[in-house]
Swiss-Prot record:
It comes from the Eukaryota. Its main location: cytoplasm. It is found in: Cytoplasm. ANK repeats lie at residues 52-81, 85-113, 117-146, 150-179. Keywords: ANK repeat, Cytoplasm, Phosphoprotein, Repeat, Ubl conjugation pathway. InterPro entries: Ankyrin_rpt, Ankyrin_rpt-contain_sf, ASB8_SOCS, SOCS_box, SOCS_box-like_dom_sf. Pfam families: Ank_2, Ank_4, SOCS_box. Residues 235-288 form the SOCS box domain. CDD domains: SOCS_ASB8. This is Ankyrin repeat and SOCS box protein 8. The SOCS box domain mediates the interaction with the Elongin BC complex, an adapter module in different E3 ubiquitin-protein ligase complexes. Interacts with TBK1; this interaction promotes TBK1 proteasomal degradation. Pathway: Protein modification; protein ubiquitination.
Length: 288
């Protein structure tokens, strides 16, 4: 190799610090094709260094690399560190990958960490309908009724997307279905906002039925009138008008009250121990 070529390569090599190269290697941006994470760390790369808005651990979660996540944690990465967006690695993992979530939780990640908008990892797992991440977070102590800056809960986030699987799990863990955010919206009204766009699927219809069973009774009208967006869809408007006009029955209201009285726990286990007929247990668990 000529001296000029060697000089050029040395200049390129020195352009990036070891820590910058670590980020690029994790993200598979191969500026140096022969770099690997373990060698870079062994060579002195800082596993907690921030480049731009990124930290190595957060980056590994973005690309769903659970092995890399564990390696970084073994080498001293701070599990609850915040990146440039005030998010923890668990916020990113919750959106994408259960394996990364499990590793982070094993190393002490805070399941109730707040980002800059007061969103928890559970909010993001529910929004992305990553049902296994939702379950893993709840099993590790995530607050099922955590409030973001708008007083929306993970259930509200799941409902606004019609995420049936996540809604079902959250309800199993006692999520409050009548919570009202700062704009006066409830989980079921967030779902209705999706349905009125004409984008409803069979799964979203099932999500609506599940939320309706859980809430017992709901009201969308103001001064007896449906919102203008709902009124544009005659068929949906008629259906919702009937549901809103019908008073909650003693049976449905009792179901809501009993479920709420059981508190924040895994309701299928709690209901199983109640001295009730099997049919009533199924009713309490919203199985119809």
């Amino acid at each position: 190799m000529s001296s000029s070529m060697w000089y050029i390569m040395q200049s390129i090599q020195s352009k990036y610090s070891l820590s910058e190269r670590l980020i690029r290697t994790i993200a598979a941006i191969r500026s140096f094709p022969h770099d690997n994470v373990e060698d870079l760390i062994r060579g002195g790369a800082d596993v907690n260094c921030t480049h731009g808005t990124l930290k190595p651990l957060h980056c590994a979660c973005m690309v769903s690399d659970a092995d890399c996540v564990e390696l970084l944690l073994e080498k001293g990465a701070e599990v609850n560190a915040l990146d440039g967006y005030n998010r923890t690695a668990l916020h990113y993992a919750a959106e994408k990958d259960e394996a990364c979530v499990e590793v982070l939780l094993e190393y002490g990640a805070n399941p109730n960490a707040l980002d800059g908008n007061r969103d928890t990892p559970l909010h993001w797992a529910a929004f992305k309908n990553n049902a296994e991440c939702v379950r893993a977070l709840l099993e590790s102590g995530a607050s099922v009724n955590a409030l973001d800056y708008n007083n929306d809960t993970p259930l509200s986030w799941a409902a606004m997307k019609g995420n049936l699987e996540s809604v079902s799990i959250l309800l199993d863990y006692g999520a409050e279905v009548r919570v009202i955010n700062l704009k006066g919206q409830t989980p079921i009204s967030r779902l209705v906002a999706l349905l009125v766009r004409g984008l409803g699927t069979e799964k979203e219809d099932s999500c609506f039925e599940l939320l309706h069973r859980a809430v017992g009774h709901f009201e969308l009208r103001k001064n007896g009138t449906m919102p203008r967006e709902v009124a544009k869809d005659q068929q949906l408007c008629e259906k919702l008008t009937v549901l809103c006009s019908a008073p909650g029955t003693l049976k449905t209201l009792s179901r809501y009250a009993v479920r709420r009285s059981l508190g924040l726990q895994y309701l299928p286990d709690a209901v199983k121990g109640l001295p009730l007929p099997a049919s009533l247990k199924e009713y309490l668990l919203l199985i119809e």
